[in-house]
């Protein structure tokens, strides 16, 4: 053996692996397709991150709106329940804690408030462009109750609906038949005295 053959044996053995060392390779794919695949994966990841951030922001915004609505109604124990009529989608019902029940009838353009003891019912006509909030409605009913207690004016029962002529504050709505109130308001108020505010 001569010296030249020793040098050949000292070299590292040939590499028979499918992929080159230190590189990720996809067999039988050209380089430009590999780059395109990497770009597509990066774009999909960016879109997923953006959509996730938007959904998280929407969730936070919804929670904030619900919290503000609950705080505007009153105390934390105030519960609000919205029930939409399945047929006409014109009635909204709100339960204000244990203090009373409010029905917004958008078809008849009326709001009815019945306090918890259920001794009377307050009805208010609304304009479609200016629907009062629950807080404004309860304030108006409270002010009306204060005026009535100062005047000691008796309630006008539903049997006297036909006798009431005007729609002054404290009078019952005109019309002999309480059917003009609509089914939701008539169901809420029943046979208790009605006050038009």
Curated annotation (Swiss-Prot):
Its main location: secreted. The keyword Disulfide bond applies. Residues 94-197 form the BRICHOS domain. A lipid is attached at residues 28-29 (S-palmitoyl cysteine). One of its GO terms (molecular function) is identical protein binding. Disulfide bonds join 120-148, 121-189. The keyword Ion transport does not apply. One of its GO terms (biological process) is respiratory gaseous exchange by respiratory system. Keywords: Disease variant, Disulfide bond, Gaseous exchange, Lipoprotein, Palmitate, Secreted, Surface film. It comes from the Eukaryota. One of its GO terms (cellular component) is alveolar lamellar body. Residues 1-23, 59-197 form a propeptide. InterPro entries: BRICHOS_dom (IPR007084), SP-C (IPR001729), SP-C_palmitoylation_site (IPR018051), Surfactant_protein_propep (IPR015091). It is found in: Secreted, Extracellular space, Surface film. Pulmonary surfactant associated proteins promote alveolar stability by lowering the surface tension at the air-liquid interface in the peripheral air spaces. It is linked to Pulmonary surfactant metabolism dysfunction 2: A rare disease associated with progressive respiratory insufficiency and lung disease with a variable clinical course, due to impaired surfactant homeostasis. It is characterized by alveolar filling with floccular material that stains positive using the periodic acid-Schiff method and is derived from surfactant phospholipids and protein components. Excessive lipoproteins accumulation in the alveoli results in severe respiratory distress. Pulmonary surfactant consists of 90% lipid and 10% protein. There are 4 surfactant-associated proteins: 2 collagenous, carbohydrate-binding glycoproteins (SP-A and SP-D) and 2 small hydrophobic proteins (SP-B and SP-C). This is Surfactant protein C. It comes from Homo sapiens (Human).
């Amino acid at each position: 053996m001569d010296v030249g053959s020793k040098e050949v044996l000292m070299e590292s053995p040939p590499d028979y692996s499918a992929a080159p060392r230190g590189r990720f390779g996809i067999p039988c794919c050209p380089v430009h397709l590999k780059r395109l695949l990497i770009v597509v994966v990066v774009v999909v990841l960016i879109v997923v991150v953006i959509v996730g951030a938007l959904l998280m922001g929407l969730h936070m915004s919804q929670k904030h709106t619900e919290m503000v609505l609950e705080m505007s109604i009153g105390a934390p124990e105030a519960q609000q329940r919205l029930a939409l009529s399945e047929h006409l989608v014109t009635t909204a019902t709100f339960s204000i804690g244990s203090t009373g029940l409010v029905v917004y009838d958008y078809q008849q353009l009326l709001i009815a408030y019945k306090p918890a003891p259920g001794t009377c019912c307050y009805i208010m006509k609304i304009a479609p462009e200016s629907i009062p909030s629950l807080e404004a409605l309860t304030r108006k009913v409270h002010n009306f109750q204060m005026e009535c207690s100062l005047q000691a004016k008796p309630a006008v029962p539903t049997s006297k609906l036909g006798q009431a002529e005007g729609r002054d504050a404290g009078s019952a709505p005109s019309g002999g038949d309480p059917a003009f109130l609509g089914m939701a308001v008539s169901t809420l108020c029943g046979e208790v005295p009605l006050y038009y505010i």
